[in-house]
């Protein structure tokens, strides 16, 4: 008999969101040599190959990010009105309906026998479709301490534990439908490795490691074809020069090529380098905070061109944290999000404008904002994007206030004013023009 999560998970398990979009590149000390790769956890450094177009692999699918949904729908958690349990819900884009993720005919979805109900704990991530009816999840404490990658059955119960470790990064994982690429720090080690997991056999291969210096991390920040873009960083130490490095790693062989080295600067501005990076549509985009220049480098031919130098400067002129995040490409427009605040003025509002860069013309325009949403007493002007589909975005689109009752530490009940948040689909065109034309598909909380 196959177990379900709610029959095995301990109470201390906490839910963590699966993040898909990398925000900043990170750092690595001593990047001039390529770290160990090609299936060995302690391989000798190998020289970087010359920049060249990667060999074609027509018989193998391209990699894609793993997340809690696909073109057909999206998984969420919801706490039951009674507060006794949580449910996994599935929002179906085709029907526009949201329902418990349970395939048992006649189930009332309110007892431990329902695989969508969790009375004693929840996985770290929701079901993540990888194709052909296969789902993965990242869970804490399944059978032992630490974290596991598990394959789920059709009722979202644990079918097989594929990999177990003390730490697995679920922030950015890639799949081709048959394998999973992820970052992990094995038990007893102090630096990260990029591993490939065969989803059929559970076989594990180390493709790339961050070296043997304590505290070094390696994180996947993007993918192109069957290659990973990996950012390698050290534990920050202001007493010595350090650099942040990007590598292009072959997902099959582990062959690594050093793409970039960025000096780590003073972290007082809220970031560690003067370059913000993103990997979109087989291209590495880089924004230079010092010059204001935005460039694009093709990951196949390594040709670099200037996209624009017309992005506006920091609204608060360096008086606080300032972040520029390159997020996505929609209808030929590169979406660039700003975050700026003023540490010298306690009353200053955080500014979060969004700019659109026309990739053909290089022109820059501020994106018209969608109407702000108010929840828990505050206006939220930034649009929360949950997923990007082929021609639509899944976004938070509506809120609704409500009153809920809970119990204090003294056992006495009390009420809390809160908000339900709803999500829906919006076309690229409507998002870019700030037109709130949503197709609502579900409730987030």
Positions of the model-derived regions?
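Bacterial N-terminal signal peptides that target proteins for export
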Residues: 4-19
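Hydrophobic alpha-helical transmembrane signal-anchor segments
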Residues: 21-24, 38
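C-terminal motif of bacterial Sec signal peptides marking the signal peptidase cleavage site
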Residues: 27-30
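Bacterial signal peptide processing site
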Residues: 32-35
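N-terminal low-complexity, Pro/Thr/Ser-rich intrinsically disordered segments
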Residues: 42-69
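Surface-exposed loop/turn elements that mediate protein-protein interactions on large endomembrane-trafficking
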Residues: 50-59, 83-114, 144-164, 189-211, ...
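Repeated scaffold domains used in trafficking and secretory/extracellular systems
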Residues: 59-70, 112-129, 167-177, 213-225, ...
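Short beta-strand elements that form the blades of beta-propeller/WD-repeat-like
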Residues: 64-86, 123-141, 173, 178-186, ...
């Amino acid at each position: 008999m196959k177990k379900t999560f709610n029959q095995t998970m301990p109470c201390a398990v906490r839910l963590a969101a699966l993040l898909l979009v990398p925000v900043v590149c990170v750092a690595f000390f001593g990047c001039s040599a390529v770290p160990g790769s090609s299936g060995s956890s302690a391989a000798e450094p190998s020289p970087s190959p010359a920049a060249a177009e990667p060999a074609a692999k027509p018989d193998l699918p391209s990699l894609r990010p793993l997340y809690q949904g696909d073109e057909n729908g999206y998984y969420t958690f919801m706490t039951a009105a009674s507060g006794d349990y949580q449910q996994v819900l599935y929002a179906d884009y085709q029907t526009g309906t949201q329902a418990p993720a349970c395939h048992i005919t006649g189930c009332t979805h309110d007892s431990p026998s329902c695989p969508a109900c969790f009375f004693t704990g929840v996985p770290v991530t929701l079901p993540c479709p990888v194709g052909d009816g296969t789902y993965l999840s990242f869970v804490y404490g399944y059978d032992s301490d630490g974290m596991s990658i598990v394959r789920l059955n059709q009722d979202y119960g644990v079918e097989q534990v594929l990999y177990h470790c003390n730490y697995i990064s679920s922030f950015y994982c890639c799949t081709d439908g048959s394998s999973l690429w992820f970052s992990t720090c094995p038990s007893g080690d102090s630096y990260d490795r990029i591993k490939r997991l065969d989803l059929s056999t559970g076989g594990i291969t180390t493709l790339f490691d961050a070296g043997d210096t304590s505290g070094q991390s390696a994180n996947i920040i993007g993918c192109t074809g069957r290659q990973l873009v990996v950012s390698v960083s050290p534990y920050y130490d202001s007493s010595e020069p350090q650099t942040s490095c990007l590598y292009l790693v072959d997902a099959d062989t582990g062959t690594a090529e050093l793409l970039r080295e960025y000096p780590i600067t003073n972290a007082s501005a809220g970031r560690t380098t003067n370059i913000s990076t993103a990997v979109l549509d087989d291209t590495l985009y880089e924004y230079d905070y010092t010059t204001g220049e935005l460039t694009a480098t093709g990951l196949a031919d390594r040709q670099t061109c200037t996209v624009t130098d017309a992005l506006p400067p920091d609204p608060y002129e360096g008086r606080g944290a300032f972040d520029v995040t390159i997020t996505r490409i929609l209808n030929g427009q590169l979406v660039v999000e700003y975050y700026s605040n003023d540490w010298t003025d306690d009353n200053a509002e955080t500014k979060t404008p969004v700019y659109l860069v026309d990739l053909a013309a290089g022109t820059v325009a501020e994106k018209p904002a969608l109407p702000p949403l108010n929840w828990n007493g505050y206006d939220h002007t930034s649009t929360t994007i949950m997923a990007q589909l082929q021609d639509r975005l899944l976004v938070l689109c509506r809120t609704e206030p409500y009153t809920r009752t809970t119990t204090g530490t003294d056992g006495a009940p009390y009420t809390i004013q809160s908000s339900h948040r709803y999500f829906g689909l919006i076309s690229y065109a409507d998002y870019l023009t700030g037109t709130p034309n949503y197709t609502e598909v579900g409730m987030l909380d």
